[in-house]
Amino acid sequence: KYLSKEGYATGYIGKWHLGSSEPVKKEDRGGYDYWLGSNLLEFTSDAYETYVYDGQNKKVFLPGYRVDAITDAAINFIKLNQKKPFFLFVSLIEPHHQNNTDDYPPPIGYREKYTGKWSPPDLSSLVGSSPRHLGGYYGMVKRIDEAYGRMIDVIKSLKLFDDSAIIFTSDHGNNFKTRNREYKRSCH
């Protein structure tokens, strides 16, 4: 809201996870001008079938791998708003466990590329799901790196990079069922 008052175009794309309903009510969206999100993206979509809601709460299908679909929407927002200051919050769900199946679904071809590769020694010594899941997890992380690289490339090509602040954060890592029988929710 504050940035909008200062003339910024504001946008939110991806997983919200702060609302109490699906789709998220307009008054619960933090005041963003542009909205393309879902409160619980892991329940409204899967790796290759991404559904979000637009500013009018209409369900929107985004084609392709979910990281790529959200990234494509973000790049579109950047291009449409390049002539004025903008604030864009991109919330990727990956590298999140897919809730409807015991898997970390990476892009096609990425699981094979990373399965059997390096595993942190402390993780390898614990009983859990890392031998089965780490290849998919690493593939998801690699695709996130590529996605942010794509966004940064667009920002650079539009000559916006020197006047931009890019902040990357994460809400949780993963313990691969080594601390409890779930993939997260452990205090350690």
Segments from the language model and where they lie:
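Formylglycine-dependent sulfatase
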Residues: 1-188
